[in-house]
Amino acid sequence: MREYKFNIPCNISDQHRIASILSSLDRKIELNNKINADLEEMAQAIFKNWFVDFEPFKDGKFVDSELGMIPEGWKVSQIADIPHILETGKRPKGGAVEKGIPSVGAEHVKGMCAYDYSKTKYINCEFAAKLKTGKINGYELMIYKDGGKPGYFIPNFSIFGEGYPFENCYLNEHVFKLDFDGNKEFNIFCYFFFKTEKIMSYFNAQGAKAAIPGINKKDVENIYIFSPDNESVIKFGEFAYPLFKQMLKNAIENRTLSLLRDTLLPRLMSGEIEVLE
């Protein structure tokens, strides 16, 4: 059997205090994750109630539309007809580098506050400075653009902001950024709208057609959506925006706590940092 050496404090009391410190950090991270899940679930429930089931509007008249039967007076538009920016980024020919500006790829678009820092890749600062597209400014809708097995495409979405996952980062060529002229509230509305069964099925079908599974700009811009000037859409955005802001702040705090935990552990175990009673 091989011999391994571990730096473990001999004092049992010190071991317990170290475990207590690390456990408190883990508990706070878990609490933030639960809060974020609850906040998104709350927003999702309101969205479904208003824009899928139309519960608050069932006593009124409904009319036919490109989205099916909807409350009378509601406007529907194609994304192509709503002022927006839909773009992707790119990477240099040589690929990623070890240090520089973070480059966000499809593997990072996994829902809200689910960025995997262990998979972060970078582009050099000089290349980033020349890019005319793909910079993440905050609260744009990130769309998983392409990738996966032939004939099989599962779309996913995310919204970054408030310095999460980074203060400065760019997209690569496998992610779309959709922004309705800086309308954060409508971008958030679109996040939930794209997650509805109807739109997910549409993306599934469109993405599976290509040799390399994925969607293009036309696929996105052809989508019909409730117009941003609908009163109910505006009210939902005003409700959901503070929730998303808090979720992003919690995610940033979790990143700080994770780094603190990972930095403290070896220093506590080695005795470099003394554990006070």
Show which residues each predicted segment covers.
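A short glycine-rich beta-alpha junction/loop motif
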Residues: M1-H16, F166-F176, F203-I234
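Short, ligand-facing micro-motifs at secondary-structure edges
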Residues: K110-K121, Y144-L171, I188-F192, S201-Q206
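Sequence-specific dsDNA recognition surfaces
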Residues: A80-G95, E107-Y144, G148-G151
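Glycine- and charge-enriched low-complexity intrinsically disordered segments
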Residues: F180-K198
